[in-house]
Amino acid sequence: YSHTKGMVEDLLKNYENILQFRLRMPIDNQLDNPRNFIFKIANYDCVVDVPNSMTVLDELVPYAIDGALRKLTGIYNFTNPGAISHNEVLQLYKDYCSPNYTWKNFSLEEQDKILAAPRSNNELCDKKIKSAWPQILNIKDSLIKYVFEPNKQSGGKVRGGAKGEC
């Protein structure tokens, strides 16, 4: 993936009229969506507690449309400002949606032993996105407003669940 991303970015930099968004760990308010980051980590047997930049689609997709209409160009780290750890996300899920939910942690070293490919953990620069849309919420506030509050109202829950051991 990162090799392809780099190649595409090298090609696109030659064009002046391109607007490219880099999403990271996309989250939407459909907690039963298998492509949703929350669904994924809630169904892992164990999670690594590391902070990352993330994209709350319900908030940011309208800004993508706005950016196109405003004819913005360039590459944007299309993530909510700040970073949040996996444990913080799961704690919000537990607090708002599933009080009996539990999870286990393991270390990066333990994770590396079971993964086919290494994972990257990043807090991406948010200066450019905050300049274009200063009203964008930080990641935690966005998760609460666009994902957890609506699911608290509707009773939304992740389907499935981790069954194994770390």
Per-range role (PLM):
Residues 115-166:
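C-terminal amphipathic/interface module of NAD(P)-dependent oxidoreductases
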Residues 63-121, 147, 158:
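Mid/C-terminal beta-alpha module of Rossmann-like enzyme folds, strongest
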